[in-house]
Amino acid sequence: FSFFRNTWSKESTIITLHNLYLQTIGTLWKAQTECYRKLQDRPDRSNEAKMVKDAMPVVIIEGICRPHCSHAAANLEKMSRLAMYDLDHLNERTSAVKALFRALPYVAYTQTSISDRGLKVVVFLDARTPEEYPLAYAICQQTLERIAGHPCDEQCARITQPCSCVWDADAYYNPTPEPYPWREELDTDPSLTNLIKDKRNLPGSNGTPYATSNGSSSPFPPATEACGYIETFARNFTHYHPWQKGNRHESMLAMGRSARRKG
């Protein structure tokens, strides 16, 4: 799968899950991880904490992105058959839930989040196309949430959602995971397709598929060079400059200045 030096980069290399594990348990990202954890609870230094996190390398667990392109979903050109789940705010339950997931045959990897309060979990999902990925992801998510007794972050259901690298000496790696049996579960209970329909009907979601060049449909828009960059830019801008009622013009001017600095 793809490895980017930070969330803004359009230059990626290919890394294996085993290599990610070795770098995670080593000291490569230890200093940045400890720095973020010291800053995250200080309101006067929240911007510094955000900058430390944004500067961390990220991986796109779901596969390989096109060369010299962002990690936007439309730039995914080869599937890894893996999927990443994020359980935030586990807090004191983090270690216990990590132990639960280590016992599951389809879990390939776990790491503690950079916040030290949640988990990133990689599952051998065996989804072979972007079109079948959302349903496979949702079926497995339901199982993980039941086992953990805790919800997964819905934002990470988006294919190619970047996963921040981190230092975790207690990370877990399973070199021979079994595929999660989502196809068998779907055959047994066809109503599981409603998991996707329900998500598409949420406020702000768009359930309309996009046409592809071969006449089929896809849940992802056509590839553009800018889409991943723009999404990341907007998310980071609103973090540093929260929207305030009555300040529309000032916010637009600030966004324009920030965009010019980014080139």
Predicted regions and their residues:
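Short beta-strand
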Residues: 109-115, 153-158
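Catalytic "initiation/cleavage/transfer" segments centered on a nucleophilic residue
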Residues: 3, 127, 147-199
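A common structural junction motif
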Residues: 105-107, 141-150
